[in-house]
Swiss-Prot record:
Modified positions (N6-succinyllysine) in chain numbering: 149, 156, 194
Keywords on record: Acetylation, Cytoplasm, Gluconeogenesis, Glycolysis, Isomerase, Isopeptide bond, Lyase, Methylation, Nitration, Phosphoprotein, Ubl conjugation
Pathway membership, UniProt: Carbohydrate degradation; glycolysis; D-glyceraldehyde 3-phosphate from glycerone phosphate: step 1/1; Carbohydrate biosynthesis; gluconeogenesis
Family annotation (InterPro entries): Aldolase_TIM, TIM_sf, TrioseP_Isoase_bac/euk, Triosephosphate_isomerase, Triosephosphate_isomerase_AS
Residue list for modification Phosphothreonine: 173, 214
Record-listed substrate binding positions: 12, 14
UniProt protein name: Triosephosphate isomerase
Keyword DNA damage included in the entry's annotation: no
Species in which this protein is naturally found: Oryctolagus cuniculus
Complex and partners: Homodimer.
Location (main, coarse): cytoplasm
Residues where N6-methyllysine is found: 194
CDD domains per record: TIM
Phosphoserine: residues carrying this PTM: 80, 106, 159, 198, 212, 223
Length: 249
């Protein structure tokens, strides 16, 4: 990892937790050592964004797990970047595979959300990744490049974007891409950014890995030159998240 890219660890709590156990988790995180060269962001369920921001130490940022593409309006059940900021969160996760494949969000919609969130001043954790049948068909590169292009077309300022590569077959399955598989895709993504955006953006943009990251797998993954951190699901609700935060130490 280039010295200019600050290690980034995101915890996606998904639709889990209640105030009691999340409060206990937050107490653990607040007591944890967060290295100065590591950025940590937690994404609670929408109902708990305010709660998390009030309880978490300021050294840990808060993200929403999703947002809509406009500021206000008749969009029942949606939240806007402006509302997210109003609750004290500074990041949003967009394009997560569960949004794509469970809720049917298209590349186009995700691109529009990215553009709006950035225009409103939020940082964006933009997720991409292939399904198992796509990997087995040998089209991983094609799929992730197409997804990345739609995101890139909607980004003016890359300093507020973290790209999260999440092979869908490795999310919540206990299967992790090998460090070599992760590095190979991350390296190709950086090459795509260099060819299609700029060398400067390719060098400075953090590309993080998501997909069954645990305290046991994180150190070897973090040692890969193009793996700049993690987006962690299940393990982010457990004390081992602290080990993942310290994967580079």
């Amino acid at each position: 990892m280039a010295p200019s890219r600050k290690f980034f660890v995101g915890g996606n709590w998904k639709m889990n937790g209640r105030k009691k156990n999340l409060g206990e988790l937050i107490t653990t995180l607040n007591a944890a050592k967060v290295p100065a060269d590591t950025e940590v962001v937690c994404a609670p369920p929408t109902a708990y964004i305010d709660f998390a921001r009030q309880k978490l130490d300021p050294k840990i940022a808060v993200a929403a797990q999703n947002c809509y593409k406009v500021t206000n309006g008749a969009f029942t059940g949606e939240i806007s970047p402006g509302m997210i900021k109003d609750c004290g969160a500074t990041w949003v996760v967009l394009g997560h595979s569960e949004r794509r494949h469970v809720f049917g969000e298209s590349d186009e919609l995700i691109g529009q959300k990215v553009a709006h969130a950035l225009s409103e001043g939020l940082g964006v954790i933009a997720c991409i990744g292939e399904k198992l049948d796509e990997r087995e068909a040998g089209i991983t590169e094609k799929v992730v490049f197409e997804q990345t292009k739609v995101i890139a077309d909607n980004v003016k300022d890359w300093s507020k974007v973290v790209l999260a590569y999440e092979p869908v077959w490795a999310i919540g399955t206990g299967k992790t891409a090998t460090p070599q598989q992760a590095q190979e895709v991350h390296e190709k993504l950086r090459g795509w950014l260099k060819s299609n955006v700029s060398d400067a953006v390719a060098q400075s943009t953090r590309i993080i890995y998501g997909g069954s990251v645990t305290g046991a797998t994180c150190k070897e993954l973090a040692s890969q030159p193009d793996v700049d951190g993690f987006l962690v699901g299940g393990a982010s609700l457990k004390p081992e998240f602290v080990d993942i935060i310290n994967a580079k130490q």
